[in-house]
């Protein structure tokens, strides 16, 4: 039986990505403080909830870590398997899925924004800057952070396809769009109810808590 080498390399890339994605600093920070971050605040073990619960420094650390882990997974897979034309895309997608659905945390993970940013950064600084610009415009217009990963998970794969001509890789990247949307259904419901946090919480946390009707937990 002949073994398909590229298939094995893609599988290895997926394993690297998923294992890296499961590393969750927000959850660890919560444990060190004596609580499960998935049961406090928004319930999301990611940067935004860490900012709400522990402040900007902790939240920015979580964001930087999550961006970095995706960038490392993509870069490492591309370096290890240069002849596999979808190694980076497979690793990046698996990292996002590992972050959102980590086996180590009962498949209850984050929502993928920072990891999406990290995989894009690993492919190209130009791609990252372009997506950052357009998503910043969206964020300024709507003020809802949750809309960024939803649109990014659709927009970047299309952009990547036109930029590289690697539509197979783009299809792999685009496969996270539905899981990302599913992760944000509750956010969309809260937008409709006027209870979703806006980016304003970065400088007006108390105002956002009052506006949304959330109670800050001790």
Regions found by a protein language model. Give the residues of each.
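Interfacial segments of multi-pass membrane proteins
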Residues: 51-54, 77-80, 113-142, 155-163
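N-terminal signal-anchor transmembrane alpha helix
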Residues: 8-33
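Short, non-helical or kinked segments that cap or interrupt transmembrane helices
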Residues: 36-46, 104-117, 144-150
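Nucleotide and nucleotide-moiety/phosphate-recognizing core
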Residues: 58-64, 68-103, 126, 135-136
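Loop-to-transmembrane alpha-helix initiation sites
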Residues: 145-152, 164-176
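Transmembrane alpha-helical segments that form the membrane-embedded catalytic/substrate-channel core
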Residues: 19-27, 93-103, 178-188
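Cytosolic, membrane-interface loops and tails of multi-pass inner-membrane proteins
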Residues: 28-59, 109, 189-215
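Helix-coil boundary and interhelical linker segments in multi-pass alpha-helical membrane proteins
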Residues: 1-12, 74-90, 121-127, 160-172
């Amino acid at each position: 039986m002949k073994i398909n080498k590229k298939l094995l390399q893609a599988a290895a890339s997926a394993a690297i990505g998923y294992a890296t994605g499961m590393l969750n600093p927000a959850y660890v920070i919560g444990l060190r403080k004596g609580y499960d971050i998935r049961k406090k605040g928004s319930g999301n073990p990611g940067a935004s909830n860490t900012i709400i619960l522990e402040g900007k420094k902790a939240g920015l650390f979580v964001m930087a870590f999550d961006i970095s882990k995706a960038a490392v997974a993509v870069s490492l897979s591309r370096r290890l398997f240069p002849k596999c034309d979808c190694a980076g895309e497979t690793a990046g997608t698996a990292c996002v899925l590992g972050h959102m659905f980590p086996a180590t945390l009962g498949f209850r993970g984050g929502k993928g924004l920072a990891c999406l940013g990290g995989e894009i950064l690993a492919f190209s600084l130009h791609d990252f800057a372009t997506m950052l610009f357009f998503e910043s415009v969206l964020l300024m217009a709507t003020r809802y952070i949750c809309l960024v990963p939803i649109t990014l998970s659709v927009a970047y794969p299309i952009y990547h396809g036109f930029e590289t001509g690697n539509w197979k890789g783009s299809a792999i990247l685009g496969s996270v769009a539905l899981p990302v949307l599913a992760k944000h259904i509750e956010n969309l419901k809260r937008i409709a109810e006027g209870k979703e946090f806006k980016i304003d919480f970065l400088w007006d946390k108390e105002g956002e808590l009052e506006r949304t009707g959330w109670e800050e937990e001790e």
